[in-house]
Amino acid sequence: MKKPVWIDERDALALHSRLLALHGGAGGLRDRGLLQSALACPQQQFADAEGADIIDMATAYTAGIVRNHPFVDGNKRTGFVTGILFLELNGYRFVASEEDAAQAVLQLAAGSIDEADYSSFLRSNVVRRRK
């Protein structure tokens, strides 16, 4: 697998700010280290090369931000959009309904589904873009 296009801290902070501007919520980064940890996880999966693919790495972005809770508000939104942006940057298009996506992220945040389940959700709701 070729090296993916990664989401960095600046990208995640910009996404978070934009999502708060669009949908409201309290601004602010609660813990930079938790954000950095969430953003490093997909890259570690890639380096370990133990079967992780683009979908698993997108899940790692989403789960990392949702569960680490690095922001004061908007962690689920930011985690979801970060994962989807990662997919888009790497040649995939997300096709699930807004309702299905929201439900999956809420279940992930609540612990009702695990990362493998969320990856399965993504796999059935992304298509590879034509080159």
Short names for language-model regions:
Residues 1-131:
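FIC/Doc superfamily catalytic core
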